[in-house]
Amino acid sequence: MATSLKNLSDYDKNTIPNGADFSIGIVVSEWNDHITSKLLAGAVTTLIESGVKEENIQLKRVPGAFELPLAAQWLAQTNVDGIIAIGVVIQGETRHFDFVCSGTTNGIMEVNLKYDKPVAFCLLTDNTEQQSIDRAGGKHGNK
């Protein structure tokens, strides 16, 4: 898998535009909070390091990944310039994983298209909890 070849936190910070004039919305799922909270912290830190003012970061929390598109839509209807959608779905024994991943993915895509604002897709869809932990500040960095 490509992730095993690269630390997700390694990027050239000089290629990131100055965010001082941007307002960013973040929607984060509370399900798997021990993972999503780390992804959220990484996103906020990166935004601030890129010049986005803390007061220009709007945060909405939702129960699970399936609610991410609706909250992203709520944020898109405001004055934000872009949105980050953060969630984690871990494969279980039923097809629920497939339905949640598909619905969330399609919903976020629709918000991108309808509002002509970028919605960054930070939805971990891993086979195991450990894989998600590894991608939330663990051995693979922070997605």
Residue ranges and their predicted role:
Residues E67-I108:
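Glycine-rich phosphate-binding loop
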Residues G25, Q58, D81-I83, K117-L123:
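Structural motif
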Residues K60-Q77, L124, T128-E129:
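Glycine-rich oxoanion-binding loops at beta->alpha junctions
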